Amino acid sequence: MYIPDTTFYMHEYAEGTSGGCSIDGVPSFQWTIKRASDLFANKKVVIFGLPGAFTPTCSSAQLPMYDILFDEFKKNGVDEIWCTSVNDAFVMHSWSVDQNLKNVKMLPDGNGEFAQGLGMLVDKRNLGFGMRSWRYAMVVNNLEIQRMFIEDKNPAHMYPTDPFEVSKAEYVLEQIKHSSNQEELF
């Protein structure tokens, strides 16, 4: 299975700025439109999806551990790590600044199209969240999904909080290490 070739609306920020709307009336960012095929072709990446920026588990455990363990992922053949959420580019950028990220790249899925294309878009209106990404991680090699780590989502709409076991950075890294002698992760 291949990842959906979704369009992402992203920002490139001017050198020396931390984002924001403008500097003396001049935007500190430039809108860029990227497709999944532009971002992930000819690379081995880990992409992890989570319910929302600035939420407790996402901010205290999931996102920071991927950033901390980046060098270990790199030693095991991963080129890049991307975090995606059904949030816009402004929110994702502000969250990356707040988290002081050094290694993980942010993938804003503001319309939820990437999550939907993967079957990971869930209805969280019962919690006031609207449509959100389910918590998952995947290893993608040249656009092909080698393995998905999907948290238990049966029934997804009933969870007051989201399960957090198999999409943890530590777990995904161990699975990659364990399969390093195999051609594929399946």
Task: Name these PLM-found stretches.
Residues 1-186:
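Chalcogenol-based redox active-site neighborhoods
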